[in-house]
Design a protein with these regions (language model features):
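Alpha-helical protein-protein interaction modules
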Residues: 1-288
Length: 288
């Protein structure tokens, strides 16, 4: 947080400087754009410094400048990208404050802007990634509202699109990490709705997509174990079988992660998600 607070002053000075230049030279477009970009950066550091009200104000000021430019002469693709980021970040501020409905509106606006960049014959990979991030945040907001079915539908769609993006651009860590984030949100939703039996296919898709990243099978194992933990006292034979299946897959995932060089900072047995695995000999053989 201290690092973000230290970054606030340069962004503040930049915003003030370009605002003055914009007032003195209203026809110079680059001053308007730079003032708006500085405000967006200021909002980012304010949010990460624990100042959501100030961040919202900065984002709204940046949005107002970009949208005025858009009405007057249109925006370059680069400026559309920054405007979409402003709306996406504004949505995050609203969700942080549990103003979920307002967050949905902001995320939808970000999606609409991103689609201006992706609805072309050959969209830039970064534009596709930006769209998927906004769509993921939009779906996550529905989870906050406990509209699990709607959230799951949206998450599955964007997970598939993100899988395609990762396949098209192997080795991009940001693209890969977002696929992992989407998987985690899908797992959260399936646990919340007692649909743990639907998780393994998504786990398979992710591990096949990123076979060389040791953190992927480790994270997959975590969510499988967490899901198995929800079946702590299975009442039926089917539930007992599902619990065992999920636990065994979690153990296999940990084994794969360790073989790829993953080294957990803390003993796995201390993690709440792995308590359910304590009863399995294979788990103890793996970590002892």
């Amino acid at each position: 947080q201290k690092r973000y607070e230290e970054a606030q002053s340069p962004y503040q000075r930049a915003a003030e400087t370009f605002n003055e230049l914009e007032r003195d030279f209203p026809r110079v477009v680059r001053y308007q754009e730079r003032a708006a970009r500085a405000l967006m950066g200021l909002g980012l550091v304010q949010r990460n410094s624990g100042k959501p009200v100030a961040a919202e104000k900065s984002y709204r000021q940046a949005i107002a400048k970009f949208e005025a430019m858009d009405r007057a002469r249109g925006l370059t693709p680069a400026s559309i990208d920054v405007l979409a980021a402003c709306y996406n970040n504004l949505g995050n501020v609203h969700v942080d404050a549990e103003n979920i409905e307002e967050g949905l509106v902001a995320f939808q606006r970000a999606i609409t802007l991103r689609q201006r960049l992706t609805d072309v014959p050959y969209p830039m990979p970064s534009a596709r990634y930006g769209l998927h991030r906004a769509q993921g945040n939009y779906a996550n907001a529905y989870q906050k509202l406990h509209d699990w079915d709607r959230a799951h539908e949206l998450l599955v769609a964007v997970f598939e699109d993100q899988r395609s993006l990762v396949q098209d651009h192997p080795g991009n860590r940001s693209f890969e990490s977002h696929a992992l984030w989407l998987f985690a949100r899908i797992a959260d939703g399936l646990r919340a709705t007692s649909r743990g039996e639907e998780l393994p296919p998504f786990a398979d898709t992710l591990t096949q997509l990123l076979p060389q990243r040791p953190d992927v099978p480790a994270q997959v194992a975590y969510h499988l174990a967490l899901t198995a933990g929800d079946l702590d006292d299975p009442e039926t034979e089917a539930e007992r079988e599902l619990k065992d299946q999920l636990a065994q897959r979690a153990i296999a995932g940990l084994e794969a992660a360790l073989q790829l060089g993953w080294q957990p900072e803390d003993p796995l047995a201390e993690e709440d998600a792995f308590q359910v695995l304590q009863q399995y000999d294979e788990f103890h053989a793996l970590i002892d």
